[in-house]
Swiss-Prot record:
Signal peptide: none annotated. Zinc phosphodiesterase, which has both exoribonuclease and endoribonuclease activities. Belongs to the RNase Z family. RNase BN subfamily. The keyword Zinc-finger does not apply. Pfam families: Lactamase_B_2. Homodimer. The keyword Cell membrane does not apply. This is Ribonuclease BN. Its EC number is 3.1.-.-.
Amino acid sequence: MELIFLGTSAGVPTRTRNVTAILLNLQHPTQAGLWLFDCGEGTQHQMLNTAFNPGKLDRIFISHLHGDHLFGLPGLLCSRSMAGNAQPLTIYGPKGIREFTETALRLSGSWTDYPLEIVEITAGEILNDGLRKVTAFALEHPLECYGYRIEEHDKPGALDASALKAAGVKPGPLFQDLKAGKTVTLNDGRVINGADFLAPATPGKSVAIFGDTAPCASAITLAKGVDVMVHEATLDTSMEEKANSRGHSSTRQAAQLAHNAEVGQLIITHVSSRYDDRGCQRLLAECQAIFPATALAHDFAVFTV
């Protein structure tokens, strides 16, 4: 998987950072997919500066209905129709996402010429496509807000064809069942368990993408043990009380959560527009003092999971 940050600013854009939007390129050899997490104003314009086509998006996950995470959605939906050949799209988000989307399209005389499904979610598993699952966790913010945990299923180990041949099992249709870990009966009556001839499974990758939040009880479960955690760091540690009062987190709190949840890497984003480049580096240093494996996202930054 690959994360591409299209916008990393909190609340309003700056000259160098747009508001929140993150692409997740699934990069699966047999079932590719392009997912978008949040869609702040100008997201479709940001995508023009990447190699990715909005028409290829197949799922959009909205964390909450604040404008800096949402106002780019109607325009993106319409542009997909104007460009043509857009594939079916499913939007996930909190209660109100359907009314917002349908009202924006209706009042502007707009429409979509591709299948569009809107799913209003609650906390819990919201998607399992056989290759990965997505679980939504309620966060602490003035509006109903969610974070998303994306987990690939473990990849089955390779079938040891040499060992099977040594056991007298010839290559053929049975190999598919054995590769799936099934038990098969040979013509001579022998019973072969495919699991005995498989290499260990490769653990799937996992990502936790937080919406806006103050520290909350669900955060540790959302992030526990993931390879990459994407979390807001709206304000520095000295402004922690102000951040929390508005449903946001400080650098220290993001880093401490990453440490407690034992994640592989922390990527901080959603940085207040009050910070220039030097200020952003100070935010990064505050996080790294607690959790060294921290990176600071900037617009168009790409991270491999």
